[in-house]
């Protein structure tokens, strides 16, 4: 499970939480695009990636 700080960041700004774990990898870019198109899909993806 992701650390508390990563998940907390992901709730408010999803790409930041993913960036803290994966850097500028594919997960970050997918999360950024999802968040730009609609916040909720980006949030769901960020929580999923951080807790898998």
From Swiss-Prot:
It comes from the Eukaryota. The chain crosses the membrane at residues 4-24, 30-50. It is found in: Membrane. It is a multi-pass membrane protein. Keywords: Membrane, Transmembrane, Transmembrane helix. InterPro entries: PMP3. It holds the Pfam family Pmp3. Its main location: membrane. GO terms for cellular component: membrane. Belongs to the UPF0057 (PMP3) family. This is UPF0057 membrane protein At1g57550.
């Amino acid at each position: 499970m992701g650390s508390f700080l990563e998940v907390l960041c992901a709730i408010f700004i999803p790409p930041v939480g993913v960036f803290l774990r994966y850097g500028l990898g594919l997960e970050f870019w997918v999360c950024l695009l999802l968040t730009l198109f609609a916040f909720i899909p980006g949030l769901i993806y960020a929580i999923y990636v951080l807790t898998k």
